[in-house]
Amino acid sequence: MAALWVAGVGRKSLTVVASGAPRREFWSRLRKEKQPVVAETVEEVKKEPILVCPPLRSQAYIPPKDLQSRLESHVKEVFGSSVPTSWQEISLEDVHMKFSFLARLADDLGHAVPNSRLHQMCRVRDVLDFYTVPVQDRSKFDELIASNLPPNLKITWGY
């Protein structure tokens, strides 16, 4: 360790010299020289225009006539051929079995269970109830246009 000694005492400052160098020179050796900051060029990405009317999220779904037999055959494929007679009461607690069962049904019927309803599918009966409900792809405005409106009320899309 270098010996410190006071080189001079003034009224406003105290100069300390370590190993023969003034304080400013001592600390300046430890500082790294600052490199000039180079600004990177950023390419401007043009965004696509926002659509005026977003596409409909759900597609039309009409349940087939043989829905129960299709469901029963998928239950036998996924859960094995030794399915009890009350196949609608089979529990869907096993996540892997539930996924494979619902994925096969979605491929077969062309209509998938949305994520917001997956937690409600606890038994095969819940899945059957979901797939028996038909889905229309029309909005409320389309239904209003198709309904019998009074002559003083008219809905136009091209405004």
Swiss-Prot record:
Keyword line: Mitochondrion, Ribonucleoprotein, Ribosomal protein
Stored InterPro entries: Ribosomal_m50 (IPR018305)
Subcellular location: Mitochondrion
GO cellular component: mitochondrial inner membrane; mitochondrial large ribosomal subunit
Pfam family, one: Ribosomal_L50
Predominant localisation class: mitochondrion
Statement: the UniProt record of this protein carries the keyword rRNA-binding: no
Keyword Zinc-finger: no
Family (UniProt): Belongs to the mitochondrion-specific ribosomal protein mL50 family.
Subunit structure as annotated in this protein's UniProt entry: Component of the mitochondrial ribosome large subunit (39S) which comprises a 16S rRNA and about 50 distinct proteins.
Identification of the protein by name: Large ribosomal subunit protein mL50
UniProt source species: Bos taurus (Bovine)
